[in-house]
């Protein structure tokens, strides 16, 4: 894997995450992803719902004293983990990455289900994540100015999908990127985006 992402993507993989967190952090995120799946698919009786809710409330209270700033948080900064260790993101895994192109794979699960297919908003999130990190390869921070997604077919839940993205051109502070999502040989969605580098002092 070749990866040299900027402020959104973080430091190069070889340098390691800014704050890797506790050794068991990957296990925590994996358990959270599994919980999302179980809750999505479950229709438990009232007593089980009550017990589960109370358990989750206790876990939230356990973690609350350890809240840190965005810059210090572990979730979202672990480039070595699927989806950067951010449970909101589909757990994509990078196969190839450089300044001009990315190849990644993702398996969308029931948590990301719309109606008999992947939720369209999830695909927007996935494209914004991958295209945004590609546009942020380098020292400058860029933000999404425009993102257009075309739904070319049904994106299924379950199969291993292929996601490719590339930088089409750069004009000053503007970076134009595009991406394609495939289920085997079938194009299920594509996207084009514009990301603009921030000026000094811009948040």
Predicted regions and their residues:
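HotDog/MaoC-like acyl-thioester-processing domains
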Residues: 2-70, 155-157, 168-203
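Hydrophobic beta-strand-centered segment that forms part of the acyl-chain substrate-binding groove
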Residues: 3-16, 129-162, 195
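Long amphipathic N-terminal alpha/beta scaffold segment
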Residues: 49-117
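Short solvent-exposed loop/turn micro-motifs enriched in small/polar/acidic residues
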Residues: 85-88, 142, 160, 172-174
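Conserved positions in beta-strands of structured domains
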Residues: 95, 150-152, 164-168, 182
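Active-site helix/loop of acyl-thioester processing domains in fatty-acid/polyketide metabolism
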Residues: 97-101, 118-141
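Intrinsic-disorder/low-complexity, polar/charged segments enriched in Ser/Thr/Lys/Arg/Asp/Glu/Gln
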Residues: 99-103, 146, 160-162, 176, ...
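Hydrophobic residues in beta-strands and at strand termini
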Residues: 106-108, 151, 197
